Amino acid sequence: MTKLTPEISLSVSPDLASPDLESLRDWIRAHRVEEIECVTPDFAGIARGKVMPAAKFLRESEIRLPVSIFFAGITGEYADVDHPELYSDGDITLIPDLTTARAVPWAGEASLQIIHDVVDRHGEPIAFAPREVLRRVLRAYEAKGWTPVVAPELEFYLTKPNTDPDYPLEPPVGRSGRQSTGSQAFSLSAVDEYDSVIEHIYDYAEAQGLEIDTIIQEAGAAQLEVNMMHGDAMKLADQVFLFKRLIREAALRCGSYATFMAKPMAGQPGSAMHVHQSVLDAQGRNVFSAQDGETSPAFDHFIGGQQKYLPACSALNAPYVNSYRRMVKYMSAPVNLEWGYDNRSTGLRAPRSDPKGRRVENRVIGADANPYLAIAATLAAGFLGMVEEVEPRPAVAGGAYDNERDLPYS
């Protein structure tokens, strides 16, 4: 892998105190932005939208797309859905969320991408749009005076360019001139093999104003993990959505591919999107911790809700046939929803922490999941557990792989 210096077309993103179209207009002119990418996530988490000159975006009253963008699968084929709107394929209107304006640093000219919400012809939110699904869950928390906090960890593989799907994916050649073949988890030398891609990731993330906590080598050959800072659930879902595209572009710039398939290579561990979750009350206190610093009933009930309801959410956490190839015993992936303290063999892990940082890690979600839908599902399950006071099963102290499987096989 040749060492390349990142070429950045726009190295900074808007940081507007109270974003509105006029302040964004001034920023666009000051930074000589040429193009705007109007994007919205589909069910697969793919960015769908339109690209237009900045001047057109600033004067455009409405931007529209056909509703069929939500009925296309990851291959582009339309799902067999009996929905009347699919037959007429009418328009939906995009509404820009100006707080999401970010540079497109890999573009040939200065460009911004802006995530949009979508409404129907009556101006009502499209209920099944991924951001709206997550927003409804967050409103349920808000009605109780709670605020969920999440921190995603996103795993992915770097591979050699592969243009023929009949051939298996292979690790790329690193800076040493060799392919990675074995497990080198947490090896700094393994990370250094792909320092060109990682440098591009860091530079692109800085240009987009995205915070990276850490980047590590995972257990697979050329498998990396990006850990994100904890924060607001919608903002973090937006960041995962943006990061996937950013990482793919960084890899392409360095002559390799990045894949978020749950199980891209036989014999190698799969890729997950682990999500750490906690809940704050109106005073900003972690509801998972009691006043004496021990675990609270809300902590137990949150876990109980995840155990009760996450199996029904499997299509959101593991959306493809390939997703279930990841869930294999002794391959760094859970096969059930047991929980335990600092136990990575369970689907739900309670990491070691102080009372303020007490949280529950969902280790079931695959890297191929739509971040909005997966985060909505895991938070909804925990919410129902707290509201219904669902008691969890006893914590597992040892390995959980041989416990009864309660996650589906397909």
For the regions a language model picked out, list residue spans one by one.
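Catalytic-core signal marking the mid-to-C-terminal active-site face
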Residues: 2-11, 242, 249-250, 256-258, ...
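ATP/Mg2+-dependent ligation/transfer catalytic cores
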Residues: 2-214, 236, 373, 407-410
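Accessory "access/gating" subregions that flank catalytic or transport cores
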Residues: 185, 189-194, 198-212, 226-233, ...
